[in-house]
């Protein structure tokens, strides 16, 4: 019963549907189609677009998968929240860079580990740079 229904759709109804579609002979013929003819073509064109997309989807470029979902992988994991407080008045250098990627071996001071992290994940994180105001 089910196979007979499927066979009827494929052998009888689908060819009859395709014969009734207002497909023009040339590209210019698409311009002359009326609104009702376009509405009759929409389901057919939608199915063609879906099949085309499904055919090329494996070849589309995929986003680079991030290697790790956690940001902080190892620094002060025993604390519920990592906070480092540094008084700006205590800065002895003209410029200081602090880590924001959590990959630095000298955390909280930046050692440039974000460069490798950015390369691997496609991220764009960088350090927090504090400079003394020049007067």
From Swiss-Prot:
Spans within the Cytoplasmic topological domain: 61-135
One GO CC term on file: endoplasmic reticulum membrane
A Gene Ontology BP annotation from the UniProt entry: regulation of autophagy
Top-rank lineage group of the source organism: Eukaryota
Keyword Chloroplast: no
Primary role: Regulator of autophagy that contributes to antagonize becn1-mediated cellular autophagy at the endoplasmic reticulum. Participates in the interaction of bcl2 with becn1 and is required for bcl2-mediated depression of endoplasmic reticulum Ca(2+) stores during autophagy.
Subunit architecture: Homodimer.
Protein name: CDGSH iron-sulfur domain-containing protein 2A
Organism listed in the record: Xenopus laevis (African clawed frog)
Primary gene name: cisd2-a
